[in-house]
Amino acid sequence: QQWPPGHHIPP
């Protein structure tokens, strides 16, 4: 999955 810069990735 793609996350924006500085985004917190959930577990």
From Swiss-Prot:
Keywords annotated in UniProt: Hypotensive agent, Metalloenzyme inhibitor, Metalloprotease inhibitor, Protease inhibitor, Pyrrolidone carboxylic acid, Secreted, Toxin
Subcellular location(s) of the protein: Secreted
Region forming the signal peptide: none
GO molecular function: peptidase inhibitor activity; toxin activity
KW Secreted (keyword) present: yes
Disulphide bridges, residue numbers: none
Tissue: Expressed by the venom gland.
Residue numbers carrying Pyrrolidone carboxylic acid: 1
Keyword Kinase (UniProt): no
One cellular-component annotation, GO: extracellular region
Biological process terms in GO annotation: regulation of blood pressure
Sequence similarity: Belongs to the bradykinin-potentiating peptide family.
Function summary: This peptide both inhibits the activity of the angiotensin-converting enzyme (ACE) and enhances the action of bradykinin by inhibiting the peptidases that inactivate it. It acts as an indirect hypotensive agent.
This protein's name: Bradykinin-potentiating peptide 11a
Provenance organism: Crotalus adamanteus
